[in-house]
Amino acid sequence: SDPIMAQLLVDPSEDVRSVTCYDPSAGTGTLVIALAHAIGEQNCTVYTQDISDKSSTMMMLNLILNSMSHSLTHVIQGNTLKHPFHKNEDGSLRKFDYIVSNPPFKLDFSDYHSDLKTDSYKGRFFAGIPNIPSKNKKGMEIYLCFFQHLLYSLKEDGKAAIVVPTGFITAKSGIAFKIRKHLVDGEKSILRGVVSMPSNIFANTGTNVSVVFIDKSGVDKPVLIDASKLGETIKENGNQKTKLRTEEIQQIVNTFRNKEVVEDFSVTPTFDEIKEKGYSFSAGQYFDIKIDYVDITEDEFNRRMDNFKTTLRQQFNESHRLEEEILKQLDCIGFNENVGKENSNE
């Protein structure tokens, strides 16, 4: 799924040069390096930030191994949400041409929640910050903050892809709903598409995930793909993982790029249709429900109805017989005053 995000973000027909690529929760850099490969290592500069020291060190090593040493100085260890590092000379946050992200979905960020509430970058968290729950602070949906940070950090003609728990694409209220509404109802509709993936597709989560694709230059019609039934289950480091076959990856890529409509797999609804469906980004909600009609003669219809009635009568009769049997059994049950006395006398 790492290369598939890159393939869907970068069209091979595009001549992409001198661009910036960013991952605000980069880990060891798998996603952003796959993106750099799709663009061409010498045609892009990579910028990352991650809270883990160890991951950031691995990220640097990955850049060296992938002939991208020119980006080493842009690998930053730090808290992206509280202290975003990459800025312009005037102190404003830097904007990027391409962004990819597979952020943590849930994390306790109660200790810097108030910092995000009073964020100095106006409008960065436009849809709000998840509340601190009284219990289970580890369940705080931090990915919603990363999603908003990603949108804020994207150039006006930039493209992005972010991994979200599949619940995000259908949530009927709250921050998730506000973000989806913004992608559809903003000055421009910027939702490029959504691919709902099979479960266990990413190593770090067993949650069902979807990938949301954004194109800030504006979109006429998005493509929604339900790829949740694809893939084969494999064992990796003792854990079950789903792996997409080569032909399945190609199927998703071709469908997405060409905006094809495939029965029970992909749809291209208008943004008005998406509004009518409560801003749902789930392909399944737009699939046609098919009813198969069979041509039969009147005699055949009557014969089937007679058989149906006969079967139903037999079942009714059997049901009555069982009712009578149960009532008879209940009549045989009488009160026994000795029950319980033996135990009480011990």
Label the predicted regions.
Residues L93-E346:
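A conserved structural/catalytic subdomain of Rossmann-like adenosyl-cofactor enzymes
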